Amino acid sequence: MKTTVKHFNELTPEELYGILQLRERVFTFEQRCSEPDLDGFDKVAYHIFLTDENGTEACLRMLPKGVLHDEVSFGRIVAAKRRQGLGEEVVQAALQAAKDVFDADTVEISAQAHARKFYEIMGFVTEGNVYEEAGIEHIKMFRTLKND
């Protein structure tokens, strides 16, 4: 599995297509999100994605501090296959990129509530109550990177 970290402007058409195709499959068809996936933030994001001979297997986008959240954040996390470790692998790559690309001390996410335990295992802590975003319950979570 190859891990790639690129700003939107660096993506090839093939890479962008693979990312958007995977996101569409999950967010539009599986989860039936009530808001459009293409929200304009992809253009300022770094995209972290895992590929193999089958194409894009997992991806997320990372946004600079102050774009959507007070801290560096990531979202649009998708894995083609569940329970294969792909989600953990792409999140670990994002945590490393937060340090390397943004020199971040903290990462903030708006996690889908059903994935809370997944993120807690990865060192995230919750703040506040569950809220609705795009028709899906979410919770604000943070991870400190200082000791990594």
PLM feature segments, named:
Residues K43-V44, L68, E133-E137:
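Short acidic/glycine-enriched loop/turn segments that link adjacent beta-strands
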Residues L63, H69-K81:
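Conserved acetyl-CoA binding element of GNAT-fold acetyltransferases
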Residues A98-A111:
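Conserved GNAT acetyl-CoA-binding A-motif
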Residues Q112, E132-D148:
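C-terminal "cap" of GNAT-fold acetyltransferases
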Residues E120-V130:
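Conserved acetyl-CoA-binding loop of GNAT-fold acetyltransferases
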